[in-house]
UniProtKB/Swiss-Prot annotation:
GO terms for cellular component: cytosolic small ribosomal subunit. Pfam families: Ribosomal_S13_N, Ribosomal_S15. The gene is rps15. The lineage of its organism: Archaea, Methanobacteriati, Methanobacteriota, Stenosarchaea group, Methanomicrobia. Disulfide bonds: none annotated. Residues 11-26 have a biased composition (Polar residues). The keyword Ubl conjugation does not apply. InterPro entries: Ribosomal_uS15, Ribosomal_uS15_arc_euk, Ribosomal_uS15_N, uS15_NS1_RNA-bd_sf. NCBIfam families: PRK08561.1 (NF006331). It comes from the Archaea. This is Small ribosomal subunit protein uS15. Part of the 30S ribosomal subunit.
Amino acid sequence: MAKMHTRTKGKSGSTKPIRSESPAWSTATTEEITKVVLDLWKQGNSTSVIGMVLRDNYGVPDVKLATGKKVTEILRDNSEEPNVPEDLYNLIVKAIGLRKHLVVNNKDVHNKRSLQSAESKIRRLVKYYQSTKVLPIDWKYKPETAEMLITR
């Protein structure tokens, strides 16, 4: 499968094993996992970091198998849902960093192209999230106000 704004192929990755239930050696209960997820979220961790901490420190290989819900669903049920989905958040942070870099280095044409690619991906993701009703229809990405968007 090709990457979006290059001619190269992406790296191949491993696939998750097909399972319908949590493994027997994972003994964490749904309540414990929910408590840890909420604590880690309040400390300022992202959903992917929460999943890695649960995997590495608490022996939970898959939150969805253990609880029946994804990390974002657990947060949504406890009124702690993020304003912006994590992949969109990361792209906005990248675009902000590139804009700051280009203010100082305005002749850096390669990173101007990187900024264009990042903002194209942002617009494409916004359109997707609006169609799936994750973001409101009137939600817009504006580079001038992007830093305010990413604060929790």
